Every structure is written in C-alpha cells, then in structure tokens.
Amino acid sequence: MKKMRKRSFHELVMENKKELMTNTEYLNQLEEKLEQRFKQK
C-alpha cells in the first residue's frame, strides 16, 4: 500500500476555491434561467 501524501493547506484552499467558483457559476446560470422563464410569462 502506498502512503497517501498529505495535501498542504494551500492545495486544499485552492481546491475549495475552484469548487466555489464552479458553484457560483452554476448558481448564476440557474438564476438567469429562472429570470428568463419569469419574463416569458
């Protein structure tokens, strides 16, 4: 069994930032879709 290298704090922070970015982008897209649907009615 290989020992898993512990990720540094910096790496974890960077990963979290990437995830947050994708999450906010996703939420923005959802918001736009909802607005478009609302305008159509």
Swiss-Prot record:
Domain of life: Bacteria
Protein name according to UniProt: Uncharacterized protein YnzL
Natural source organism: Bacillus subtilis (strain 168)
Upper lineage: Bacteria, Bacillati, Bacillota, Bacilli, Bacillales
